[in-house]
Amino acid sequence: MTEKLIRKVWIAVSAAILWGCGDASSYTAVDGVMLGTTLHITADVQGVSAQELYAAAMELDREAKASMSIFDPGSLLSRLNRNETDSVYRHIAFNLHLADSIGALSGGRYDVTVKPLVEAWGFAGRQAERHPDVDSILAFVGREKVRVEEGRLVKADPRVQLDFNSIAKGYTVDLLARLVESFGARNYIVDIGGEVRCKGGNRQGGPWRIGIETPFDGNMSDGEYVQKRIRLTDGGLATSGNYRRFYLDADGNKVAHTIDPRTGRSAVSRLLSVTVAAPTCAEADALGTMFLAMGADDALKAVRTMPDVKVYFILADEADGYEEYISPAMEAMIMQ
């Protein structure tokens, strides 16, 4: 089936679970908070209560934040960024390895050394600088400026800082899925803040259904508007967009949280939403950020050279409407 741009739609950005599974009495369901956002688990775990499953998830939550959080000053990543340690343990090592793989596809648009730029633009817990000195900051941004040698992080410049926010949530979803499987689950869906990993199907034997929301700039409602439904039986899915984390600068220009590390500036284009399905949620998470940072034209060119990549883009058109792009590999997963 050939790729195509199809009818105009409203913006669809974040992924939400559609729990239309019928009677799920044989499944254990957990709802809570993880990584500071929503947590949902539905799984046919064996011999474990919802309370025990949630407690195990909270232990993983503490482990993930202690390693990869840029907001926790005591995390390993924060201490690496402040040059208080150079030790690289497994979570950091995995994130760096995946970042290198995605970065190689990105033409320089995906780079986890962007933290100083993210801070300057006000998206890492600091107030935005009125006129960030982008050129000066770019002098110590670049994946080539940091390497790992025998389990130690070596920086070419001590000002280099890492930010794994484009991977860490998806990676934690994958860790949570592994945890659920350790409790005997053969069918499950886990969701942290709209990033999803699933296996098998619902109690009736059908696929899990993931809803792609139809929000708009500033919309904070989860799951109220659904543009597309995607069937998923194995793997990860993540949706990236710039409709929640943005602000208008003094000149009225939109400044979004996705930063192009080549220019040091916000990557705002007519590409409004990117949904990626991949074998792991970490891959889907990182690829979504990569495509957003590329912008509409380059993202469309890139994905057309990747026949196995499963993506769903929503783009603004010139008439204040919207268009969809569904890659050939994704088409069979679209339910409507």
Label each residue range with its predicted role.
Residues T2-W10, W19-Q336:
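Mature catalytic core of soluble alpha/beta enzymes
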